[in-house]
């Protein structure tokens, strides 16, 4: 037994030299081995197996150290000029907030700085993006700067596509992918550093991840968390993580002139929104002609609420006989071959018609002008009707300023706002976090599956209202995800078999319940078609 104790001590000493994921496996194997030591006649053989596993785990880490990719930084990027400060902050703090204007280079350069700070050896550097399009584009950019093919040192994973390898150091992914990984890797031991990018968007996934990561950091002091954000209230992230340091990085910007070009007011003010929607194509065309006539040729980025509006606008501008002008769409679900056209060299003038994916997630090159109608589709949940919708709403001042910042990177720019200065001044400073305007059923279901306790005490940056929580719980009970109970505390609710199955489906719980029932009734194929339409 004394020899076995010495063996156990030797194995435990190796924990600091192997990956965090292998350390968990090694610890589990050792614990199991010690439990049966007195009864198992093959104990020596199992000790040899564990010693071999530990040696191989050590070799894997050494191989990662020896094969680190060559790191370089474009000298003209503002974030590169803060290189030493950022690397030092990452090395000396568990959480770092990096706030930077669009065009500062933070998205593509911070992962490499994490690698230089010693991350990526005993785990992967995970880098989340709100959109699949951005995850792929950023991965391609970082791999290109490192002079490597995508999928080697740098890879990406989005729904239905995994372009990573066991040798990858940096893994781009959507925040939804990281969220799904918590179900089988609750302490996220595959990672030694996590970067939450575009955190200012405050989507439901981002807010839940930031709350979840706060609990993980307490259990994993070696895990690094980097939060990158546009210059929109970075202090809220710092407060949430015990006054974590904030590093502010300026962008490469030239002066941007703002021109207000509001529509003519209708006689009946109640028809204002309808009139605006009908006149929008004419207003965009008018703004484009103004820019070309008054300021000279240049590429134009036009923000529109959604795909339908983009396709309608393409049809309208296509009939406007704009000679020498190429019109391209940009939205998250666009085919990758069409997305790549945005980044290719061209002659003449381009009009890029984009959703708010181009607001912060993607930097469209060569933009000199921006046309901003001042609207976007925002997810809203109605407690009265129990329905979530995507109405077109006015954007906040912060979003308007983000859009303005998309031009003025290659020279002085012009932003035409298709609304008045008075309208801008009356707008909200920031967009409400999605968690305050959404149905929380999916979040509550995920929390129950992860045994995270009471929703009300979970460390959200902005805690949801009690009514939202109650509505979410009631919906899940109606779907059969929870056993019926009189309690309102999540700890008092027990997931049913249906609830466990729903928590593994990456769709709204109501749609997931349709899928489960469809499978039960032998109508899965037909139900999947209906759910696909409802989920878009």
Regions found by a protein language model. Give the residues of each.
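P-loop NTPase motor module signature
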Residues: 1-514, 518-521
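Short secondary-structure transition/capping segments
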Residues: 464, 534-536
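C-terminal helical accessory/scaffold domains
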Residues: 524-534
């Amino acid at each position: 037994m004394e020899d076995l104790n010495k063996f156990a001590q030797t194995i435990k000493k190796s924990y600091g030299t192997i990956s965090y994921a292998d350390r968990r496996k090694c610890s589990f194997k050792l614990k199991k081995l010690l439990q049966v030591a007195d009864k198992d006649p093959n104990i020596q053989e199992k000790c040899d197996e564990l010693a071999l596993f530990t040696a191989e785990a050590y070799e894997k880490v050494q191989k990662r150290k020896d094969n680190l990719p060559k790191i370089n930084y474009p000298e003209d990027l503002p974030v590169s000029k803060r290189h030493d400060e950022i690397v030092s902050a990452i090395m000396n703090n568990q959480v770092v907030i990096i706030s930077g204007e669009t065009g500062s280079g933070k998205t593509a350069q911070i992962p490499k700085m994490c690698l230089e700070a010693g991350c990526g050896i005993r785990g992967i550097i995970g880098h989340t993006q709100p959109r699949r399009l951005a995850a792929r584009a950023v991965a391609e950019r970082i791999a290109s700067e490192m002079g490597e093919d995508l999928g080697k040192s740098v890879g990406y994973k989005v729904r239905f596509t995994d372009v990573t390898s066991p040798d990858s150091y940096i893994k781009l992914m959507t925040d939804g992918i990281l969220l799904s990984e918590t179900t089988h890797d609750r302490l996220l031991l595959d990672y030694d550093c996590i970067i939450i990018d575009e955190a200012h968007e405050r989507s439901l996934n981002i807010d839940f991840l930031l709350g979840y990561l706060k609990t993980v950091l307490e259990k994993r002091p070696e895990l690094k968390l980097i939060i990158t954000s546009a210059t929109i209230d970075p202090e809220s992230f710092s407060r949430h993580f015990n006054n974590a340091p904030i590093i502010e990085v300026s962008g490469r910007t030239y002066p941007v002139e703002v021109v207000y070009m509001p529509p003519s007011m209708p006689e009946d003010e109640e028809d204002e929104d309808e009139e605006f929607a009908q006149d929008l194509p004419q207003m965009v065309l008018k703004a484009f002609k103004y820019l070309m006539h008054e300021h000279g040729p240049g590429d134009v980025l036009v923000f529109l609420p959604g795909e339908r509006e983009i396709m309608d606008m393409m049809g309208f501008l296509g009939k406007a006989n704009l000679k020498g002008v190429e019109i391209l769409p940009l939205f998250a679900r666009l085919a990758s071959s069409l997305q790549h056209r945005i980044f290719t060299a061209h002659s003449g003038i381009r009009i890029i018609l984009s959703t708010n994916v181009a607001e912060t997630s993607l930097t469209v090159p060569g933009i000199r002008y921006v046309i901003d109608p001042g609207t976007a589709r925002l997810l809203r949940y109605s407690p009265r009707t129990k329905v979530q919708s995507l109405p077109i709403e006015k954007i906040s001042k912060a979003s308007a300023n983000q859009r303005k910042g998309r031009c003025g990177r290659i020279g002085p720019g012009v932003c035409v706002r298709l609304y008045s200065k008075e309208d801008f001044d009356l707008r909200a400073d920031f967009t409400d976090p999605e968690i305050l305007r959404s149905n929380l059923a999916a979040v509550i279901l995920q929390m129950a599956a992860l045994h995270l306790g009471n929703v009300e005490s979970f460390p959200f940056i902005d805690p949801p209202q009690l009514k939202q929580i109650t509505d979410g719980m009631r919906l899940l009970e109606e779907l059969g995800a929870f056993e019926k109970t009189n309690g309102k505390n999540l700890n008092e609710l027990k997931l049913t078999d249906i609830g466990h199955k729903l928590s593994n489906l990456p769709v709204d719980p109501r749609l997931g319940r349709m899928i489960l029932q469809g499978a039960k009734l032998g109508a899965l194929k037909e139900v999947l078609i209906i759910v696909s339409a409802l989920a878009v």
